[in-house]
């Protein structure tokens, strides 16, 4: 392993419409096969339809949905003396956002609506109201961490 300096993370340019770095990251996570303009179109259409349905600001709904999906703790496998323990660890802020966005996109892809924009809008509206598949995923992760609280002293 080279002993040179650690290279910092690349800066993501904010999205052109709302000037939000978080939204730009979300577009990148949604993007398939490098088709960024398609991903942007899907996200903006979803945000517009969400704002229309709820009457709130585009970014406010998006932020609220993300906040309700962000995990506080997760479990990591740790091998101790021949057996593997699921050790609960706190999630770093950058990873919190990444996981929340990934879970939102996964949940939206599994929904039954016609277009991806409709699925994404429905999932984000559900998440902003603290329901839906993405929120359930977060609850499952928290439940798993809570169940393995006894192994918290194995943290590294």
Swiss-Prot record:
Keyword rRNA-binding among record annotations: yes
Biological process, per Gene Ontology: translation
Protein name: Small ribosomal subunit protein uS7
Gene name linked to the record: rpsG
Subunit structure: Part of the 30S ribosomal subunit. Contacts proteins S9 and S11.
InterPro entries: Ribosomal_uS7, Ribosomal_uS7_bac/org-type, Ribosomal_uS7_CS, Ribosomal_uS7_dom, Ribosomal_uS7_dom_sf
A single GO molecular function term of this UniProt record: tRNA binding
Keyword annotations: Ribonucleoprotein, Ribosomal protein, RNA-binding, rRNA-binding, tRNA-binding
């Amino acid at each position: 392993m080279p002993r040179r300096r650690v290279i910092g993370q690349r800066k993501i340019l904010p999205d052109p419409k709302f000037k939000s770095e978080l939204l730009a990251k979300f577009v990148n996570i949604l993007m398939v096969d490098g088709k960024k303009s398609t991903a942007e179109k899907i996200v903006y259409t979803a945000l517009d339809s969400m704002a229309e349905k709820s009457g709130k600001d585009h970014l406010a709904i998006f932020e609220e949905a993300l906040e309700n999906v962000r995990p506080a703790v997760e479990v990591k496998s740790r091998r101790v003396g021949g057996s593997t323990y699921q050790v609960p660890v706190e999630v770093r802020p950058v990873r919190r956002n990444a996981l929340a966005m990934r879970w939102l996109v996964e949940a939206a892809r599994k929904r039954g609506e016609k277009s991806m924009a409709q699925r994404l809008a429905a999932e984000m509206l559900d998440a902003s109201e603290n329901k839906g598949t993405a929120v359930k995923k977060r609850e499952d992760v928290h439940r798993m961490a809570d169940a393995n609280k006894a192994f918290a002293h194995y943290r590294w």
